[in-house]
Design a protein with these regions (language model features):
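Alpha-helical transmembrane segments of multi-pass small-molecule/ion transporters
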Residues: 1-313
């Protein structure tokens, strides 16, 4: 068990580097990585979400009732800024339909699971970050399909009901199961969560393997455009999230949490939805996969920057 914990700690610490290496391998040498199929994406995402559920406790939801304003501000920013920024970038860069769908899906998804760790590293308000992630994830089955319909409905047929059912199945059900297991078998989960970074990172890496290796040729021809759009989307999310907090005169720790929570998305869910509901557009899965790689890099850099500025204050 101790060996697994050490491996898990290593993987958690160097997740960004591991993701980059694997993504590059799947891009330039897709053959060996193509053993991981895109049909596995939903199952792999479910594993990540189950792991998230194992870490949730009733106390994590207290911030919703003790500081509703902060959570509301953060979640409203999450579901207004990122979808709009995604749509705006698809228009500015005249993205083809299949790429535009993928970018919009990233924008309409809830906060990413690694945002809580980045907020902790940034010396931000961790309780607010956890609360925002939990609430935005619970709201996702309703808001993600509706926002996707709003921003992508002019380009493609969007079935909000089917998307709702998909999100419930691959996100809410695994989280709820993890939460229940943690509640009734707390001593077991205390041991299990020690190797959670290893399990979650492995699942995320496999999702990236599946998507990148299956679309390597197309990524090679349009990869730079996708990367530019994804980077801008992510960075603008950080910037506007922080700006909203400052405009509403929230303290710096809250601004950091909102900034990171808004900028980091559950891009695995975006990839899952693209594969399940827009299979006729294979490239729609790519923005989510690229975002998964990029936001772990940018999140770590931003967290380090925020932490340094906090030390100087």
């Amino acid at each position: 068990m101790k060996t697994l914990e050490k491996v898990s700690d290593f993987v958690g610490k160097y997740m960004a580097a591991i993701v980059i290496v694997v993504a590059a391998g799947a891009l330039f040498f897709p053959g060996p990585f193509s053993v991981v199929k895109t049909s596995w994406v939903n199952t792999l995402l479910g594993i990540v979400m189950f792991g998230m559920g194992l870490t949730l406790k009733p106390n994590d939801f207290k911030v919703v009732f003790s500081r509703p304003k902060d959570v509301i501000v953060g979640c409203v920013a999450q579901f207004t800024l990122m979808p709009f920024l995604a749509w705006m970038l698809t228009m500015v860069f005249h993205l083809p339909t299949e790429l535009a769908i993928g970018v919009i899906l990233v924008g309409t998804c809830p906060g990413g699971t690694s945002s809580n760790v980045m907020t902790y590293l940034s010396k931000g308000d961790v309780a607010l970050s956890v609360g925002m992630t939990a609430v935005s994830t619970v709201l996702a089955p309703v808001l993600t399909p509706l926002l996707t319909l709003l921003y992508a409905g002019q380009r493609v047929d969007v079935n909000p009901v089917n998307m709702f059912l998909s999100i419930v199945k691959v996100v809410l059900v695994p989280i709820a199961l993890g939460f229940v297991v943690n509640h009734f078998f707390h001593e077991f989960t205390q041991q299990a969560v020690r190797v959670l970074p290893l399990v979650s990172t492995t699942a995320i890496v496999l999702i990236i393997c599946a998507v990148v290796s299956a679309n390597s040729a197309k990524i090679m021809t349009s990869g730079l455009l996708i990367l530019v759009v994804v980077v801008l989307h992510n960075l603008l999310g950080y910037l506007t999230g922080y700006a909203v907090g400052k405009a509403l005169k929230l303290d710096t720790t809250k601004c950091r949490a909102i900034s990171i929570e808004v900028g980091m998305q559950n891009s695995g869910l975006a990839t899952s939805l693209a594969a399940a509901h827009f299979a006729q557009y294979p490239l729609a899965t790519i923005p989510g996969a690229v975002f998964s790689v990029w936001h772990n890099i940018s999140g770590a850099v931003l967290a380090n920057f925020y932490a340094r500025t906090a030390d100087k204050q």
